[in-house]
């Protein structure tokens, strides 16, 4: 959350790598060199081909997510899925299988990463059977796991 809050005002650092680096460093989230490089790389790719990031075309959700993972340095399946979930909460057919959901399946995310797509497929199937969007089900599970009544403890950072 601190890292996002530090850089969310794009116009304050747009095109200025050293200013972006300072903002990330001051947020004290670590890995400022890599984060700066990854964010600058994403900025260039995004603004050079916006449609590639906003429209999946004929791709399945999984194909689109996998395509984006290859294009966005520093993001894997979970964080890319999270972005898609937030952008398309009701129709998204990929889900952020974070450490908590790996634990739900009795797995360790570090050791069992190869099972990501299998547990994601199961999660999506279970959600579809219950007629609940997977993102909504995941948010409910995550909030409950964090002993929170709702997602406001982190989502406030997306406002203003």
Model region roles, listed by residue range:
Residues 10-13, 46, 157-158:
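Extended hydrophobic/Leu-rich segments
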Residues 1-31:
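Structure-specific DNA junction-binding interface
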Residues 1-2, 15, 47, 109, ...:
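Short alpha-helix boundary/capping elements
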Residues 23-47:
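Extracellular-facing segments of soluble proteins and assemblies that are Gly/Ser/Thr-biased and enriched
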Residues 35-43, 51-160:
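C-terminal accessory module of base-excision DNA glycosylases/AP lyases that mediates lesion recognition
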């Amino acid at each position: 959350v601190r890292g996002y809050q530090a850089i969310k005002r794009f116009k304050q650092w747009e095109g200025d790598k050293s200013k972006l680096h300072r903002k990330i460093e001051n947020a004290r989230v670590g890995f400022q060199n890599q984060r700066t490089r990854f964010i600058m790389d994403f900025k260039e790719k995004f603004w050079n081909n916006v449609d590639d990031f906003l429209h999946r075309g004929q791709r399945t959700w999984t194909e689109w997510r996998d395509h984006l993972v290859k294009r966005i340095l520093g993001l894997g399946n979970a964080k890319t899925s999270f972005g898609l979930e937030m952008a398309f909460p009701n129709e998204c057919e990929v889900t952020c299988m974070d450490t908590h959901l790996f634990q739900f399946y009795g797995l360790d995310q570090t050791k069992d990463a190869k099972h990501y797509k299998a547990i994601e497929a199961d999660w999506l199937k279970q959600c579809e059977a219950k007629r609940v969007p997977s993102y909504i089900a995941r948010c409910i599970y995550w909030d409950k796991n964090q002993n929170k009544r709702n997602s406001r403890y982190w989502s406030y950072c997306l406002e203003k």
